[in-house]
C-alpha cells in the first residue's frame, strides 16, 4: 500500500511538472478564452480569464461538465469530489490533498464576488484531465484521460437518514469517497403500503440522489423501509399472502416512481424486540421469509420489464435472539446481502459503562460475551449465511455515561446517568466529538482496549465515559472483513461523520 501511495505521489508530481513545461499562450488580450471538455464548450456566467500568467475558469460549470461536485467546508476551505475521489483545497493556498495524499498547485484558487475560480492547468491535472491549448483559437481543450480509481471489491453501504437534512447535512456532502450504496432512511408503511417517511425532506433528497447517480452511474441508491420507529406494521404486512403481495407491489411502485435501485428491508424486529408498542407474533419467523420471497419475486418481475437490476438487502439485528427468530439460511438465499447492525451492544438503557461496538469479546469480562461483532458474525455463519452476504456494521457515533467510577479508567463501571450529547443524551456523533475536541482533549483521555479492538474516552473530573469508533478501530474492522471473506461494511450513519474522517479511513482500508 505504501509503495502504491508513493507511486501516486510521484506520478502526480511528474505530470504537474510536465504540464508546467508547456508554455501558457497569452492569447489575444481582446478575445475571450474558451474552455471545452471532450469537444463541447463549457458555458459559464463569468468568462475564463488570466491572472499572473494562469488561466482561471468558474468552478461549478467546469465541475458539472466533468462529473465532479464542490462542497464548502468553511469560508475558504472546500472539497471537490466524485465517487471514489476527493480533493481538499483552500482559497488562496497552493496546498491540496488528493484522497488524503499531499498534492501541490502552481496557482491557488481564488474567490471573486463570492464565486470560486480554479486554475485550469493545476486543477485539471488533479481531476485526471488532459490539457491542450490552442493559441490561434484562444481555447483550452480538456479531455478525459479514461483513468478512474478502481472500485473497491467490497460493498461500502452508507445509511443517510432524512433528519440529517434538518441539520443542513445534505446528501452531496457524503456521496464521494468510495460509497457504493446509499440507503435513504426511512420510508414508512401506511395501510400496508410503502409511503414517504418525511415528505418535507424526501422529495428534495430523492432528487439529489438522482443527480448524484447521474454524476456517478456506479452509485446505487436504495430506499430503506421501516427502521426502529416505523416497524410496527411489519407483522401485519407479513401475515397473509394478500398483505404480502400488496406490500411488495407498493414497494416496487415506490422504487420505480422515485428512481431507486432497490429496497432495504429494516424490520426491527420479527417475533420480539423493538418498540414496546410494536405488534409481534411467533409466526413472524416464517412470515418474514415469505415476505422477502414475495418482494423478491415482484422486484424480479419489474427487473425483466424495466431492464434494471433491483436489489433487496435487509438490515439485521446483532443479537442471538434475532437469529433464533428468523430463518436466516432461507433469507440469505433470497436477499442480495445482509446489513449487520453490529453496534448498540450496550447503551443508554443500561447503568454500566461498556463498549457499544466491540469487535471481539473479552474473556476476562463475562458480560461482554455475545456482545461483539465477531459473536454476531459467528452466529450468522452458523445459521447458514454465506460470509460474502454479510456486511459488517460500523457506527459513526458513540454512546456515553457520566458519573462513572474511576476504576479501569471508567470502563465497566457503575454510572449515575447519561452524558450530555449534542442531539440527545448519551449519544455522541463522531463529528461532534471532533468539534468539541474531546478526543484526547478538554479533560478527556483516549484509552484503547486491545482485546475488543475499540477505543474509549474518559474524563476523571466528571466521570464521563464515551464508547465510540475511530480510525484505528475501523482499520481492525476492515481487516476483519477481509480475513472473514465478508461482503463489506455498512455505516450508520454517514451524516454523523460530517468531517469525513471515518468514511475516508473506511474506504481506504477496504481497497
Predicted regions and their residues:
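Short, well-ordered coil/turn segments that N-cap beta-strands
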Residues: 152-154, 178, 217-221, 259-261, ...
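Glycan-recognition patch characteristic of GH18 chitinases/ENGases
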Residues: 145-255, 353-356, 414, 420, ...
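Primary recognition of N-terminal secretory signal peptides and signal-anchoring hydrophobic helices
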Residues: 2-10, 20-153, 158
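Extracellular low-complexity, Gly/Ser/Thr-rich intrinsically disordered linkers
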Residues: 439-511
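A cross-domain feature marking catalytic cores of carbohydrate-active enzymes
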Residues: 160-162, 186, 223-227, 267-269, ...
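Substrate-binding surface in catalytic domains of secreted glycosidases
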Residues: 192-203, 270-430
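Conserved, mostly hydrophobic/aromatic
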Residues: 182, 223, 265, 295, ...
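Short, acidic/polar
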Residues: 161-178, 239-256, 320-331, 373-377, ...
Amino acid at each position: 500500500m505504501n509503495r502504491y501511495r508513493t507511486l501516486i505521489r510521484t506520478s502526480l508530481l511528474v505530470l504537474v511538472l510536465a504540464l508546467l513545461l508547456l508554455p501558457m499562450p497569452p492569447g489575444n488580450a481582446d478575445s475571450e478564452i474558451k474552455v471545452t471538455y471532450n469537444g463541447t464548450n463549457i458555458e459559464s456566467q463569468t468568462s475564463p480569464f488570466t491572472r499572473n500568467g494562469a488561466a482561471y475558469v468558474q468552478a461549478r460549470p467546469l465541475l458539472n461538465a466533468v462529473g465532479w461536485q464542490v462542497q464548502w467546508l468553511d469560508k475558504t476551505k472546500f472539497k471537490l469530489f466524485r465517487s471514489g475521489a476527493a480533493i481538499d483545497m483552500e482559497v488562496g493556498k497552493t496546498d491540496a490533498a488528493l484522497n488524503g495524499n499531499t498534492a501541490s498547485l502552481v496557482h491557488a484558487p481564488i474567490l471573486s464576488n463570492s464565486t470560486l475560480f480554479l486554475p485550469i492547468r493545476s486543477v485539471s491535472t488533479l481531476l485526471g484531465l488532459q490539457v491542450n491549448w490552442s493559441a490561434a483559437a484562444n481555447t483550452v481543450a480538456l479531455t478525459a484521460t479514461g483513468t478512474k480509481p478502481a472500485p473497491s471489491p467490497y460493498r461500502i453501504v452508507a445509511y443517510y437518514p432524512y433528519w440529517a437534512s434538518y441539520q443542513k447535512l445534505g446528501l452531496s456532502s457524503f456521496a464521494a469517497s468510495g460509497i457504493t450504496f446509499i440507503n435513504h432512511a426511512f420510508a414508512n408503511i401506511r395501510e400496508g403500503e410503502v409511503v414517504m417517511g418525511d415528505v418535507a425532506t424526501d422529495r428534495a433528497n430523492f432528487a439529489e440522489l438522482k443527480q448524484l447517480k447521474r454524476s456517478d452511474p456506479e452509485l446505487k441508491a436504495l430506499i430503506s423501509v421501516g427502521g426502529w420507529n416505523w416497524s410496527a406494521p411489519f407483522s401485519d404486512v407479513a401475515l397473509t399472502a394478500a398483505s404480502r403481495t400488496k406490500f411488495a407491489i407498493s414497494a416496487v411502485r415506490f422504487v420505480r416512481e422515485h428512481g431507486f435501485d432497490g429496497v432495504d428491508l429494516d424490520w426491527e424486529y420479527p417475533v420480539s424486540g423493538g418498540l414496546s408498542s410494536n405488534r409481534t407474533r411467533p409466526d413472524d419467523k416464517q412470515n418474514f421469509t415469505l415476505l422477502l420471497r414475495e418482494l423478491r419475486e415482484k422486484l424480479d418481475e419489474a427487473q425483466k420489464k424495466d431492464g434494471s437490476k433491483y436489489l433487496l438487502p435487509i438490515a439485521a439485528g446483532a443479537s442471538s435472539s434475532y437469529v433464533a427468530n428468523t430463518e436466516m439460511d432461507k433469507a440469505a438465499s433470497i436477499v442480495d446481502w445482509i446489513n449487520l447492525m453490529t453496534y448498540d451492544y450496550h447503551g443508554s438503557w443500561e447503568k454500566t459503562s461498556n463498549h457499544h461496538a466491540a469487535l471481539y469479546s473479552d474473556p476476562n469480562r463475562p458480560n461482554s460475551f455475545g456482545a461483539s461483532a465477531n459473536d454476531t458474525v459467528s452466529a450468522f455463519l452458523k445459521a447458514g449465511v454465506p460470509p460474502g452476504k454479510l456486511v459488517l456494521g460500523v457506527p459513526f457515533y458513540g454512546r456515553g455515561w457520566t458519573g462513572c467510577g474511576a476504576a479501569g479508567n471508567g470502563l465497566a463501571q457503575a454510572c449515575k446517568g447519561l452524558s450530555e450529547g449534542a442531539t440527545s443524551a448519551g449519544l455522541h456523533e463522531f463529528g461532534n466529538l471532533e468539534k468539541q475536541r474531546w478526543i484526547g482533549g478538554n479533560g478527556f483521555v483516549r484509552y484503547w482496549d486491545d482485546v475488543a479492538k475499540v477505543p474509549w474516552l474518559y474524563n476523571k473530573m466528571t466521570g464521563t465515559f464515551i464508547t465510540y469508533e475511530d480510525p484505528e478501530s475501523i482499520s481492525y474492522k476492515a481487516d476483519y472483513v477481509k480475513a472473514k471473506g465478508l461482503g463489506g461494511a455498512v455505516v450508520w450513519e454517514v451524516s454523523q461523520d460530517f468531517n469525513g474522517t471515518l468514511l475516508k479511513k473506511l474506504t481506504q482500508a477496504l481497497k
